C-alpha cells in the first residue's frame, strides 16, 4: 500500500497510542535487555488539572528520556500518578454541589461530602491522564498512582506517626497564611501577590505617663534638624488600620536619634487602652515613613519576627472568617479595658472594621493623615481573597532537625541539581528553613492521625484516697462541670486501635471505675463531654463499669498535600511494604521539574526520603525554565497570551509541539514560544515524510527490512552519509546524557533536514540510474531508518507511523534497539570530498543571494586555482555542482575576468562573472542604504542597552527583546557588509 501524501496527525496519534498500549509497550521492564534500570517519577499533576504548557514541556522532556532508555534496553519505569490536591479538589466539588442545587459541605457532613469527592474523582479525575496520552507520554499507566490510594495513605500515616514519635512533628502556635474564604492555612505557593490601589493611614499613639520628646520638623540642606516641636505622641503608618487592635509594641531603629531615648517607654493604644512598649529593632527603617512601626505579631509576618526578637505578645483579633474577634477573646481584653467603640467592632468584617477604625480615629483626633498608596497584597490563588496572616494552632514539622542530610546529599554529590544556579537556590532555602506548617483545615486529604481526649487526670477531681470514685465524688465531678473546662490531651497512632491502647494505658492509672472505661470514638469535643458525663451518670445509677466509656475525637484537620507528595518516590513504589519495585527502581534516576517547586516539593522529598529510608529519592534533579510567549512575557489569562497545548496539538500535531519544546529547551533559559516556530517544526516532520515518499518512489522500501549495521557502500555519497549518521548518533547520545535536550534536537534537525533531505536526497538522484542503484537504495533505507529511530524519542507518532509503512518490521519502533554505531562509520576520504562539494555549492549560493542574482538564472563559473584533491572532487561531482548551484558550466583561467565575484574554497578559488547580470552600482547603493538604516537602528538599541537605568528598571521581557533585536541586527549587518565587500572587489 503506497504512502499517503501527508502525515495525518489527527488520525494517526490516537491509533498509534492505542496500539502502543495494547502491546504493553510502556510497561515497566518492556524491551529490557540489560541489567541497568531507569526510573523517573512524573511530578503528579493535580487530579483537578488540565494540561498546560508547563505540563507539556515537563512531560515531553521526561518522555524523551524514558523512550531513549527503553530503546537502549534499560529496565525502564516512568511512574505516573495524580495528586489529590486538597484545597483545589474540595473547591471544585463544593462548586459542583452548589451548581446542582445540592446541600453544601457543612450541611451534608464530612462522611457524605467525602463520598461526593470520590464520586467526582472517578467521573472527572482522569482528564489530565487522557491529555498526557495525547501528548504521547509513555508512562506505565497500569501503575497509575493517586496520593489517596490505600497504600499511599498507609505510607503517609506511618511517616507522620514515626516523625511524631521521634519529636520531629509538633503542635504549636505560629503565624500562617490564612485563607478566610476556605478557612484554612495555605502554603506560600498558593499565595499570589496582587498590586492594589490603597491608602497609607498615619495614626497617633499617645505616650504613656505624660511623657514628651522633641521631634525635628525642619532640616538644612545636609539633612540636619534645625527646628523641633514638643510631642506627646508617636506617629505610625499602616495600610491595615483594623489590625491596630492587636498591636503589642512600637518598633524604632536603635540608631534613630529621634526615638532612641524613648526605647523602653510605653504608648497607650487608642480605643483599647492597652499599654504597649517602644522596642528597638533593626526592622524599623529611619528613612521610611515616620521611622516608628506599629507591631502586630499575630497579623503580620515581619511583625511576628520583631515580636519573637523583642518578646512582644501576639494577640489574634480576627476569626477564621476574617471578622473581628474581640468580646470573647481573653487575649484581647487581658490587662486593659477596651472602650465601647472598640467592642462594637466585634463581629465586623475586617474591611468594615477598617472603615470604622479610620472614622473613629478622625472623630477622636488621632488620625494624623492619609496618603494614597499602591502596594502588593497577598491573595489566595484559588479563592482570590486577600490572605490574612493569622496566629493559629497548627501541626508543624521541625524541619531544622531533618534538613541537614538533604543539604549534605547535594553538597557531596549523592544528588546533582542542574543547572548549578538552582542548586544555590536549594541551599539558600534549606539553610534558612522555617518550621513547616503541615495541617490544613479541610476535609479532603489525609486526616491527621491524632486523637484527643479530655484531661480527667487526678488534678481534675477529688478522691478521698481509696482509689475509687464513689457516688458522691462522681456527682460532684459532674455538677462541677469540670469536663467543660478540661484541657485536651492527645495521642498519635496509625489507627484507632493503636491510639485506644495508648489511652487505655493512661486510664489504667485512674481510680475505679475510670480505669475500666472503654475508649470510643466520637465526632467532636462537645460530643465527648456529653458522652463522658452520660456514662458517669449511668454508672451512678447501675454501677456497671462495662458501660463506662472514655470518648476521644480525631483531629479534623488534614495534611498539607506537599506532605503526601513528599513521599511520592517511595510511596508509588509500594513502601512501607518491601516490594520488588522498591528494591529495583529506588532511588530513581532523575527528577524533571520546574524551578518554582524546588523548595515546596524537591527539597521536601529529599528531607522526607532521607528521614524515612535514609536514601536520596533521585540521583539527578533537572530544573527546567518557564515557557513564555514569543515576546518573553509570562503566560496569563489576564494578558490573553496563553497557548493551550491541546489546541496546538489539534492544529500542528503532537510531534511538532514536542520538537519545538525540545529544540528550545536550553538549560536554564526560558522558552519564548510562538506558533510560527511550531509550524516550522511541523514542516520538519513533513520534510522527513517527503524524503520517505521519495525513497518509496525509487523502490527503496521494496523488500526492505530492519538492519542494525549499515550496508557496504562504494559510492562516495553513500559512504559520506553513513559516516554522518554515525556522527549524529554520538551527538544525540552525548546531548541527552547531559540533559542538553536542545542540542539533541538541533543536531537531529541539522542532520535530517540538512544532510539527509537537502543534500543526500539530491546527491542520490543520479545514482538511481547507475550501477550504484541497489547500493543507494540499501543506504537510503538504512539512513532513513536511523532518522526514524533517532527522532522517535522526540517525535514518536510520525516516526512510528513511518516505521510501520516503510518496510517489513519485526517489532514496533518504540521497542526497536537504539543504535550503538558512531564515528567509526566515518570514511575520511568521502567525508572530505563531500564536505568540499557542499562548501562550494553553499558559497556560490550565498554569493548569488547576497548580490541579488535572479534565482533561476544559470551562471558560468571560472576555475582560477585548484589543488589536486579539489580537481578530483570537481571532476567526480561536476554534474551535481552545476545542477545544485545553478551553473551553466566550468571554464579555467589564470585570473578572474572583469566584473567577476571571487569565491574561495579549500584548496583553491573560483570566479563568477556578473557583468551584464546585475547593475553593480545600483546594487551597491541599495545595500549601502539598507546597511545605513540598520546601523542607525542598532545604535539606538546599543544606547538603550548601555543605559543602566533601562536595564535595571524596564520589564525583563522588554530588555530581552531589545537584546534579541540587537543580536539579529548585528547578524544582518554582517551579511550586508559581506555583500558590499564582495561588490567592492568587482568595481
UniProtKB/Swiss-Prot annotation:
It catalyses: tRNA(Val) + L-valine + ATP = L-valyl-tRNA(Val) + AMP + diphosphate. A motif ('KMSKS' region) lies at residues 634-638. Its EC number is 6.1.1.9. Keywords: Aminoacyl-tRNA synthetase, ATP-binding, Coiled coil, Cytoplasm, Ligase, Nucleotide-binding, Protein biosynthesis. PROSITE patterns: AA_TRNA_LIGASE_I (PS00178). One of its GO terms (biological process) is valyl-tRNA aminoacylation. Gene3D superfamilies: HUPs (3.40.50.620), Isoleucyl-tRNA Synthetase, Domain 1 (1.10.730.10), Valyl-tRNA synthetase, C-terminal domain (1.10.287.380), Valyl/Leucyl/Isoleucyl-tRNA synthetase, editing domain (3.90.740.10). Monomer. NCBIfam families: PRK05729.1, valS. This is Valine--tRNA ligase. It comes from Cereibacter sphaeroides (strain ATCC 17029 / ATH 2.4.9).
